[in-house]
Regions:
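Bacterial N-terminal signal peptides that target proteins for export
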Residues: 2-12
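Bacterial N-terminal signal peptides
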Residues: 11-22
Length: 337
């Protein structure tokens, strides 16, 4: 009897090894054939928050913690520190910057709003009401004297006169936020501070619409795809996309690299088909088919930072912001002749 069972056990063990190896092969992603991201040396080690450019694609501004303010005039290849005399005893953390032409805005915490009309040659402080719900969290320049600002508890305001007056867009705030994203047509999605639920808002609605998260995993970040769908990143490296125009219907969740234990922090589209996914410990993934399959950019995995934010100013100009003053700049790979 033992003589019969011994070969059978060997076959079972061999089959298990084959399955394990197959699982490992699927668990670790293939490397990309090229690396378009270059590390930019910056004169700071502060955590970076946001980047924006004027109507001149070579002239931009970078903001971050402890009043970090950097300017570039060569398309982001080099950056120079700029200081502002704000006259306060404490230090601000700048969290958002946006330009429309030569007119720009910077928000920060504790509550501060800065405005420029000369591409940043001079910055003026815009007074904010003490009754403002929360502190400025993000701002988007919409045009001449026009901008839309959100606070860290989801109050949305718009100005049409350069910040002299502000109109409330929602009647009630949503609560303390972890992350918030805005679509090009003015829709918002916000993740609660603990990642337990998310809320959406569209122009014309009086209040935010709450939604339960799609699984037991807490939400990390959410945003809009280029075709109008929502995407979400959940704890444990999980990614999920919604159905078009239905924020309650979702495709199956998946882990692009389920052998990894780190989480994702941001996702951004360079083109409708090319999607970049950033996470902790220098992890950077890319999909060239709209999120169906993924590859890993292993050339940057030794960068000693978490990648917090991916931003494409245009398909040809992109940046990844991280901790410790880490900035990656996208350089499009020359096409073969």
């Amino acid at each position: 009897m033992n003589a019969i069972l011994k070969p059978l056990r060997q076959i079972v063990i061999l089959f298990a090894v084959v399955l394990l190896c197959s699982s490992c092969a699927r668990g670790f992603l293939a490397n990309t054939s090229f690396n378009p991201w270059q590390v930019v040396n910056l004169p700071t080690r502060e955590t970076l928050s946001d980047v924006a450019f004027t109507d001149d694609s070579k002239h931009g501004w970078l903001v971050g913690k402890n009043e970090t303010l950097l300017e570039t005039i060569d398309g982001g290849k080099t950056w120079e520190p700029r200081s502002l005399e704000l006259g306060d005893a404490f230090t601000y953390s700048f969290n958002s910057v946006s330009f429309s032409g030569s007119e720009g805005w910077i928000t920060g915490q504790p509550s501060i709003l800065l405005h420029t009309t000369d591409a940043g040659k001079s910055w003026l402080r815009v007074p904010l009401s003490e009754k403002l719900p929360g502190s400025p969290y993000s701002i988007l320049a919409l045009g001449a004297k026009s901008a839309e600002m959100m606070t860290d508890i989801g109050a949305i305001y718009r100005t049409q006169d350069g910040g002299k007056t502000w109109q409330a867009m929602v009647q009630e705030a949503v609560g303390v936020l972890r992350n918030v994203s805005r679509s090009p047509d003015g829709k918002y999605v916000a993740v609660s501070s603990r990642g337990s639920f998310y809320s959406t808002w569209e122009p014309g609605q009086d209040a935010w619409q709450p939604h339960n998260r799609t699984s037991s995993r807490r939400l990390q970040n959410m945003g809009f795809s280029q075709d109008g769908r929502l995407w979400l990143l959940a704890r444990g490296g999980v990614v999920q996309f919604s159905q078009p125009d239905d924020y309650e219907a979702w495709d199956d969740a998946f882990a692009p690299e389920f052998a990894a234990s780190w989480g994702f922090l941001d996702l951004a589209y360079r083109t409708p088909e090319e999607v970049w996914l950033a996470g902790g410990s220098g992890n950077l993934l890319v999909s060239f088919d709209g999120g169906q399959t993924w590859q890993k950019d292993k050339a940057v995995e030794d960068v000693p930072a978490n990648f917090y934010k991916i931003l494409f100013v245009s398909p040809e100009q992109g940046y990844i912001l991280g901790q410790n003053g880490i900035l990656l700049r996208y350089e499009e790979t020359p096409k073969a002749a």
